Every structure is written in C-alpha cells, then in structure tokens.
Amino acid sequence: NDHVNASQSTNDAYPCATRLAIYADHLEMISHLDLLISSLERKAREFKDVIKMGRTQLQDAVPMTLGLSFHAFAQSLRNEKEHLIHDSKEFLYVNMGATAIGTGICSTLEYREACVKALRDLTKWDINLSEDLVEATSDASSMLVYSNALRTLCTNLCKVCNDLRLMSSGPRCGLNEINLPKMQPGSSIMPGKVNPVIPEVVNQICYRVIGNDTCVMLGANYAQLELNVMEPVMV
C-alpha cells in the first residue's frame, strides 16, 4: 500500500470506476436511443396523412392519423431520454481520496485534486469530487435514481411495442393497420403467418431491465452505516 495503492481504498476506487463505466455505457445507449427516436419521427412524417381510428379501452373512439401515433411514441421516448441525461450527471461526482469510510484517512487533499484532474484529462468529462465524501461512500442513490429512469424508459418502450403488436394484428381478423417487417417464418403449421418478433424481443429485454431495477432498489436499501457493500449486484 506504499506504492500502487497509496492513498487508495477499495471503497473509493471501486465506486469511482463503476460510476464512470456506467456513464460510458449511458453515452452509448443515448446514441442508440437517438436513432430509435429519429426512426419513429421519420415514420410519423411518412404516415402524417394516413387516417386510422383512435381507440380508448380498445374501443373505437375518434379518427386520428397514424403519424400522430408515431409522433407520440417518439415524444415519450424523448422525454425519458432527457430524464436519463439529467440523472446520469450524478455519476460524474466521484469519491476518490475518501478511502475507507469517507474521512480521507491515509490520503491527502492534493491526491484527491490530482485524481479528479487526471480523470478529467483522460475522459474529457466534467468530473468533480463529491461534496460530502462520507455520504458518497455510504450512499448509492445515484444508481437507484438512474435505474428508476431506465425502468420508466423501458415501461414506455413496452407500451410502444405493445401498440405495434396490436396495430399489426391480423391480417384478416385483427386491426391490420400497419405491416411489420418479416424477420422470420412465423409458423411451421400455418404457412404465411408472420409474428411480431422484434417487439416481442424488445418487450422481454425491457422486462429484464425492470427486474434489474428491483435488484438495484434492494441493493440501495441494504446500505448500512458507512458503506454499501451491495454495489456489485447493483452494477
């Protein structure tokens, strides 16, 4: 501990590394989410003059355009994107130099400042030292808040997928308002049947993320005294 690990503890180095790794994944996810939103907006423009029936409680209500449906899909995801961007900024506050419980024992202020500067230079991100290192070492609410935002995004994404499945139902005895791309043969016994496999796969991925959020919540709930030892399962 006199050389490579000087001024460090698992309780500051590990949380710092995981938060920055999550932030890196966040940036990649946002770029993919932007592509999805752009695709939905493109379809909204394409279908702006296509009339369909609007429905409440699955019953016919009033006419609308198919473009309005796709614009609403895009807007709901855009809203959640903004929440994710806002909540992700907490990952840029690190506790390097906090050492064991946040008091900074066996560390120095100069070390903390040097760490933050080195991380900024390496990543080009606006990384800062947490205001309260004891709180930052014991509390994992940044992960909880971000996971909640992911859960909400996936809940809305499930709604989009469910609507696409309903609108593509049929073709003879369902709504048959849209045609989803044929990704694979749908049945070995019913020739020509095509299943909405992409929305179904996305739904299942979302269910996993929503389940992970429960795990993150329980992990955050298990924080005791000066350290949350459940961060590995939360990450």
Regions found by a protein language model. Name each.
Residues 1-235:
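Conserved, well-structured ligand/cofactor-binding cores
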